[in-house]
C-alpha cells in the first residue's frame, strides 16, 4: 500500500487527488471536534462509556468518536448509507426509477443522486431528533427549551449533509469512494482509544493476557484472510474468432473473463449492518423498558450480542452480496458484448446459452463470497460472546471495514496509474 502511494505521488494529477482527499479528511476531523451547544459532553461521555459495547458504541466508532462528544458530525455517514440502501431498493421495486437508472444515462444518475440527497436529509432529521430525545431523556442537556432543541437538531442535520457533500467531493475529485474513505478515517481515528482501553483492562485485570493475545491474533488472521480473498477470482476462458480484413487476419486470441470472489467489497457488510442496527438504534434512543415487559424482551432479542441479531445480520450480508453482484456484473450485457466483439466461451453458443452459463458461475462465486463475508463478519461477534469480550465484536467489524476500504482504495490508485500510463503511451 505504501509503495502504491509513493508511485502515485510521483504523478502530478494523482498527487493533487491525494492532497485533496487528505484536506477533506482534515476538515472531517476538525468538524468531529466541534460540539453542538447546550450539551453536557462529560455526562454524555460517561453515559455512552457504559454502553460502549452496544449499538451506540458501534455508532461512535463509525463516526470517529463524534457521536460520544455530540459534535456537528455526530451522525456521520449513517444517514447517507441508509438513504442509499432505500433508494437502491426502490430503484428495483419502482419501474420509473429503474428506467431512470438504466436508460437515463448521466442525467438519470444525477436525478437518482439528487433523490438520495433528499432522502439523506430526511433520515438525518429523524436521527437528529432521536439523538436529541436520547440526551433529553437522560438529563444530558443544559437547556431543554424549544430554541435549544432546534439548534441541536439543525446542527446534526447540517453536519450530516456536509459529511455527505465531502464524501461526494472525494469521489469526484479525490481517490476512491468518498463515503467509504470517510468511514475508514473515522474508524481508524478510534484505534488509539481502543488500544488504550485494552491496555487499561490488562492493567486492572479486567482482561486476561490470553484474551489480549487472542484478540491480536484474531485481528492479524482477519487481515490476512481479507487480503487473500480480495485477490481471489474465477476466470472463465474466452476465445475470439479469427476474421480477415483485407490481407490481414485479426482475432483468434485466447483471453479470460475474471469474476472476483468478493465482487462487492465491504459494501454488503456496511449496508447489512445499517439495516440490522435499525431496531437496536430505535430501542437505544427510547427510555429503557422495565424488566418482564414485551419491550424488554424485544430489546434483548435484537441486541447486537443476541443470536437473533447475528442470524439476521448474516442473512442481510448474503442478500446484499447478491444484490450488488447482479448490479455490477450483468450476464446478458457481458454476453452481448462478447458476441459483438466476436468472442465466445468454448462449449457454449453465443447469446442466451452464454448468458445462462455466466449467470450460473456468478451465482456460485457470489454464494461463496457472500458466505465468506458473513462468516468473517459474524466470527468476531461469536468469539466476543463466547469469551465474554464484547469489545471484540465492535473491533472485528471495524477491522473488516478498514482493511476492505484500504484494499479498494489501493486498487483505485493502481487502476488510475495504469490508465495514465496507457494515456501517456497513446499521446
Predicted region positions:
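N-terminal cationic and glycine-rich segments that engage phosphates or anionic surfaces
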Residues: 1-427
Amino acid at each position: 500500500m505504501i509503495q502504491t502511494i509513493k508511485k502515485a505521488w510521483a504523478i502530478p494529477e494523482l498527487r493533487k487527488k491525494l492532497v485533496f482527499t487528505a484536506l477533506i479528511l482534515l476538515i472531517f476531523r476538525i468538524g468531529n471536534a466541534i460540539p453542538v451547544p447546550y450539551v453536557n459532553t462529560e455526562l454524555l461521555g460517561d453515559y455512552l462509556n457504559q454502553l460502549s459495547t452496544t449499538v451506540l458504541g458501534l455508532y461512535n466508532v463509525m463516526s470517529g468518536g463524534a457521536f460520544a462528544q455530540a459534535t456537528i458530525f455526530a451522525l456521520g455517514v449513517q444517514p447517507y448509507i441508509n438513504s442509499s440502501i432505500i433508494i437502491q431498493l426502490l430503484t428495483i421495486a419502482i419501474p420509473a426509477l429503474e428506467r431512470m437508472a438504466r436508460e437515463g444515462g448521466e442525467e438519470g444518475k444525477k436525478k437518482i443522486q439528487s433523490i438520495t440527497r433528499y432522502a439523506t436529509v430526511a433520515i438525518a432529521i429523524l436521527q437528529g431528533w432521536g439523538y436529541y430525545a436520547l440526551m433529553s431523556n437522560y438529563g444530558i442537556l443544559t437547556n431543554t427549551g424549544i430554541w435549544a432543541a432546534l439548534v441541536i437538531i439543525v446542527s446534526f442535520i447540517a453536519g450530516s449533509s456536509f459529511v455527505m457533500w465531502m464524501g461526494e467531493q472525494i469521489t469526484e475529485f479525490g481517490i476512491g469512494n468518498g463515503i467509504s474513505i470517510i468511514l475508514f478515517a473515522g474508524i481508524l481515528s478510534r484505534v488509539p482509544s481502543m488500544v488504550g482501553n485494552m491496555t487499561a483492562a490488562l492493567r486492572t485485570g479486567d482482561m486476561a493476557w490470553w484474551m489480549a493475545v487472542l484478540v491480536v491474533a484474531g485481528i492479524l488472521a482477519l487481515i490476512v484472510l481479507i487480503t487473500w480473498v480480495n485477490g481471489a477470482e474465477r476466470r472463465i476462458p474466452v476465445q475470439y474468432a479469427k476474421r480477415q480484413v483485407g490481407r490481414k487476419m485479426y482475432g483468434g486470441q485466447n483471453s479470460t473473463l475474471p469474476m472476483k470472489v468478493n465482487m462487492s467489497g465491504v459494501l454488503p457488510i456496511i449496508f447489512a449492518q445499517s439495516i440490522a442496527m435499525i431496531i437496536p438504534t430505535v430501542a437505544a434512543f427510547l427510555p429503557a423498558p422495565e424488566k418482564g415487559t414485551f419491550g424488554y424482551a424485544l430489546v434483548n432479542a435484537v441486541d447486537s450480542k443476541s443470536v437473533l441479531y447475528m442470524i439476521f445480520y448474516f442473512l442481510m450480508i448474503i442478500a446484499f452480496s447478491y444484490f450488488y453482484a447482479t448490479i455490477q456484473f450483468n450476464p446478458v450485457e457481458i454476453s452481448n458484448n462478447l458476441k459483438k466483439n466476436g468472442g465466445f466461451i468454448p462449449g457454449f453458443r453465443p447469446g442466451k446459452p452464454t448468458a445462462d452459463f455466466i449467470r450460473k458461475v456468478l451465482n456460485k462465486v457470489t454464494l461463496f463470497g457472500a458466505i465468506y463475508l458473513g462468516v468473517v463478519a459474524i466470527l468476531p461477534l461469536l468469539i466476543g460472546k463466547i469469551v465474554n469480550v464484547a469489545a471484540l465484536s465492535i473491533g472485528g467489524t471495524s477491522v473488516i471495514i478498514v482493511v476492505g476500504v484500504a484494499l479498494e482504495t489501493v486498487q483505485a490508485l493502481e487502476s488510475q496509474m495504469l490508465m495514465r500510463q496507457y494515456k501517456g503511451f497513446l499521446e
